[in-house]
A protein has these predicted regions:
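N-terminal Rossmann-like FAD-binding beta1-loop-alpha1 element of flavoenzymes
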Residues: 2-29
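Short N-terminal amphipathic alpha-helix/helix-capping patch enriched in small hydrophobics
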Residues: 16, 32, 44, 64-67
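Short glycine-/acidic-enriched loop or helix-start segments at secondary-structure transitions
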Residues: 16, 39, 100, 127
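Glycine-rich FAD pyrophosphate-binding loop
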Residues: 21-43
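Proline-centered flexible-loop/turn and helix-kink motifs
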Residues: 23-25, 76, 128
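Short clusters of hydrophobic/aromatic residues that line enzyme substrate/ligand-binding pockets
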Residues: 36, 48, 130
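Dinucleotide-binding Rossmann-like beta1-alpha1 core, especially the glycine-rich loop
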Residues: 46-126
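Short, intrinsically disordered, charge-balanced linker/junction segments flanking boundaries
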Residues: 132-136
Length: 136
């Protein structure tokens, strides 16, 4: 008799099964495809959301930061290659620059590690092919 049935073995289903394997439960995964991670997970952008977008104090803000750290920990435990390369969020106008400032403040409040607000020059130094219109 099963205690837990997991529908789908994408990254979330596989992670749930992995975590549940640490408990004395009978768990099964039911996957419609011929292989694991062969649908939505296969088509994702492979970005872990850092937590700068959600409003501070929300569950999403907390889970983004905790989930990102947990993914890194699980990869290390399972000897899965993991590259934390960061991401750039660009602004092309003063209004977008103000929005970047808000995202930066959210990230600080949410405890996002390593978050920085770059000038236009710093941004183009990192990525020389960017438009000269990049404001930050």
């Amino acid at each position: 008799m099963l205690d837990i049935a997991i529908i789908g073995c994408g990254v979330i289903g596989a992670a749930a099964a992995y975590e549940l394997s640490h408990y004395p439960l009978q768990t099964a995964i039911f996957e419609a495809e011929n292989d694991v991670a062969d649908c939505t997970t296969k088509a994702n952008s492979a970005i872990l959301h850092a937590g700068y977008d959600p409003e501070p104090g929300t569950r999403m803000a907390r889970l983004n930061v905790e989930g990102s750290a947990l993914a890194k920990e699980i990869c290390a435990r399972l000897d899965v290659p993991y590259l934390q390369c960061g991401s750039l969020v660009l602004a092309l106008s003063p209004a977008e620059l103000a929005h970047l400032q808000k995202l930066y403040e959210n990230g600080l409040a949410n405890g996002v590690p390593g978050i920085r607000l770059l000038s236009a020059e710093e941004t183009r130094a990192m990525e020389p092919g960017l438009s000269p219109e990049v404001a930050g």
